[in-house]
């Protein structure tokens, strides 16, 4: 039996190419991800978050009705009007969208801490909203990296948000945050879909 094994090894050594299965050629480049596919994924996440925000806004209005417009000075202003969509450029859109969503993430975190038991019935939904907002921000950062856009410097520490003066003030702040986030996400979906046609 040992003689047979040695004979097999000798024969294989005479044809080394047959002893090892061929592998991929060395140094073969990996296919780079398609930016349009990355943008599609970002749009899907943005649409999903838009729907989450819409549903949560409806729940907030049902549980805590508050007529009229509600503003919060610390919230970002809407990035662009619908009429100016044609002049958008991808780098500026992604940069501004990321900055605005970071602000909204901070406000949602503040709302969950500041309101406590007042918004307890909406806490699961607010927690889900915060998680998905963070996921979209990570997706935007990945998209900017894949498109080789300039890396942004770290954001300076934002001043802490003051606690609401009353429960009613907190409820008005919740309406302002969700309403502003809904408008921002709606604008983002429109802008990203338009910019996809230019890639």
From Swiss-Prot:
InterPro entries the record matches: 4_helix_cytokine-like_core, IL-11, IL-11_mml
Q: Which UniProt keywords apply?
A: Cytokine, Growth factor, Secreted, Signal
Which cellular component appears as one GO term in the record?
Answer: extracellular space
Q: Where in the cell is it found?
A: Secreted
Q: Which residues form the signal peptide?
A: 1-21
GO-annotated biological processes: positive regulation of cell population proliferation; positive regulation of MAPK cascade
Span-the-membrane segments of this chain are none
Report any Pfam family annotated for this entry.
IL11
Site note Important for interaction with IL6ST and for the stimulation of cell proliferation, residues:
168
Q: Where is this region: Important for interaction with IL11RA and for the stimulation of cell proliferation?
A: 182-190
Principal location: secreted
Q: Name one GO molecular function term.
A: growth factor activity
- Establish whether keyword Secreted is in the entry: yes
PANTHER family according to UniProt: INTERLEUKIN 11, INTERLEUKIN-11
Subunit info here reads: Interacts with IL11RA to associate with IL6ST, giving rise to a multimeric signaling complex.
Q: What does this protein do?
A: Cytokine that stimulates the proliferation of hematopoietic stem cells and megakaryocyte progenitor cells and induces megakaryocyte maturation resulting in increased platelet production. Also promotes the proliferation of hepatocytes in response to liver damage. Binding to its receptor formed by IL6ST and IL11RA activates a signaling cascade that promotes cell proliferation. Signaling leads to the activation of intracellular protein kinases and the phosphorylation of STAT3.
Family membership:
Belongs to the IL-6 superfamily.
Name of this protein: Interleukin-11
Name the species this protein comes from.
Answer: Macaca fascicularis
